[in-house]
Amino acid sequence: MRKTFIYVASALLAASGLSSCTNLDETLYDQVASGNYYNTKEDVIRAVLRPFEHGYWSIQSRQVLNEETADQLITPTREDWWDDGGRWARLHRHKWLTTNGEAQSEYNGCFQGIMQANLVIEDLEKRSARQFGFSEAEFNNLKAQNRVLRAWFYLRLLDAFRNVPLAVSYYDTSKNSEGQVEPQKVYDFIETELKEAIPELSKKTSLGGNQNLEGEWTQAGAAALLVRLYLNSKTYIGRERFNDCEKVAQDILDGKYGVYKVADRWDAAFDWNNETCDEVIFAFPGAPGYSHWHYSADMYMWTVPAKSNEWLHDKKNKAGGHNIKYSCSPSFNSDGTPYHFELGMPIARFKDYPSDVRLKKYRNLGNSQREGMFVYGKIQYTDDEG
């Protein structure tokens, strides 16, 4: 009897062992997947905002790619500083190499953001507002914001590369193009997404800055992307749409998409407290100790000459000293002979309009006020040692 019991028990163990080998479902204890991530309202908000953080980070490659290849700025070599194997000179002369990396950074950064937005959009489409305590309008707004963010990434790709793949799904890659599509298809996708998203987005209802809408895509933000799309339509798809561009821009000014106001100073949008500026339609928020670290070099350390922190009384940058990377492209040769370029030479062109207040030498006036836009000549400063 005892032997029979042992045999039966052994057979049961063997059978259960065989059956368990075919069940490979995992219970995750040390990881979070989309299936078990969305539990609270705060989880949804965190997921929705993740692609925004990536978008903020990704702008730096765009800024370098656009500015260094244009005519108004250069990165000149200063003795052995800023040569970097001719990297910046190649960008300015439009002779860059695949090893430069700026174009690849822009391409990869945008598509990473697109796939992050695709993930969030599809995850929210599988869930309901009631499940997390949202109203339908709130839930639809969150989805629409990621659609606009995705369109913003595609607008950058269209501007930089024209022919790019069109990826609209994270989970079902059969919905994505197998390769590049023509610019018209990307253009149409951007326009459709923005138009469909606008009614689902929030609208700014009063003056005094974006307030609780800071860093969110609103109706005016999406409309402003349409303005940019239409403004460059001739370049993108060979068809002018200036009338459409003018209409949407005027609608923004007239308050159709929210309450905004053109500032009475040219530099108001760049004040330290620009979150109160009603000219700002969309901006990624940043603050010391929060999301700002990505720009500590190109925004702070490399935009003004060494020792400028003493001259400007700049205490905000605690990441390192200044070492200027950018300069205005020159208007004169080293012997004082003027250049005769068709483009560039911003200083000489500003001097054609002596009443332009931006031509003054930059000076920090305190209380978030300044004058001028250029730094030139010798800088007088007093450091901590007098």
Question: At which residue positions do the language-model features occur?
Answer:
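Acidic, glycine-rich segments characteristic of secretory precursors and extracytoplasmic regions
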Residues: 8, 21-80, 92, 184
